[in-house]
Amino acid sequence: GTASAMPVVERYQSAHVLEIRERLFLIDCGEGVQRQLLKNRVSLAKLDSIFITHIHGDHLFGLFPLLSTLGLSCRNTPVVIYGPSNLAPFLNFFMSYYGKGIGIEINFHPLSLKEPEVIYETKSIEVLAFPLNHKIETYGYLFREKMPQLNVRKEAVECYNLTLSEIGAIKRGDDILRPAGPDDGASFMNGFVRHSGTDEPLLIRNDEVAYRPYVPRSYAYCSDAAPSPELYTWVKGVDLLYHEATYLDEMADQAAARHHATTLQAARCALEAGAGKLVIGHYSSRC
């Protein structure tokens, strides 16, 4: 949703679903999140982890009904939650009254950070948490795909009759240098040139025979967040930046007093960070 603390008819409160490599990550969990998940046909079975930025109600109060639903759905893996350490009493209260009844296990990872730190990692993904400038302990999250391993073009394997050891070397980023020999005749095949001859070694260039299956992408979630100079560097070069923009620029004094950002400040953060695209939200009901 794009609403902030005060509920409005047209907009739901903060919650984003991010899909990476067939894994779903839920970032914040405001009221109405389950309805939006159902409306957009998001499968809870694919939910990997939940990331809470801070314990203000418009970012949190949809979590406990969602946990109940996950229990009713007979989830057989723990619900993994990351968030500020002061989220723990809320989870403990919920589990002490309802935990046995819903039959789920919660693995909570409390955060207490002064600078960015990797909090989640797989072979293909990493998530960093970093502190945000807000009235209470608040964290932003940066999701990054890792650089994928090089693949070798099928036509190159056929053209050069690559051995398994040569394929392994190419996947590590190496060039292949074959010594001169009687079998290195000059020929063309599928765009590759076999031009060595018997008197010269054959150089197989890595950049001609290898490729990466995809370009790694990144996404940063920054809410709630008043401007801070460190934030620009922490999300430097991100492909997609979500930054709260609670107020219009003419309400900058109110934004500063409440540790929020204006639309112009969100745009400036994206510009300074060199973000590819900017998405804004968390709009005040006054705007």
Outline where the language-model segments fall.
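Conserved beta-strand hairpin/beta-sheet module of binuclear metal-dependent hydrolase folds
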Residues: 1-42, 76-78, 141-143, 150, ...
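Active-site neighborhood of phospho(di)ester-bond hydrolases with catalytic His/Asp-centered motifs
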Residues: 27-30, 47-55, 83-84, 219-225, ...
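Active-site metal-binding motif and surrounding structural segment of the metallo-beta-lactamase
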Residues: 31-82, 110-112
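Short glycine-rich, flexible loops that bind phosphorylated cofactors or substrates
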Residues: 34, 59, 249-250, 287
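An N-terminally biased module of ancient metal coordination in phosphate/nucleic-acid-related enzymes
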Residues: 66, 260, 287
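Active-site neighborhood of divalent metal-dependent phosphoester bond hydrolases
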Residues: 75-112, 286
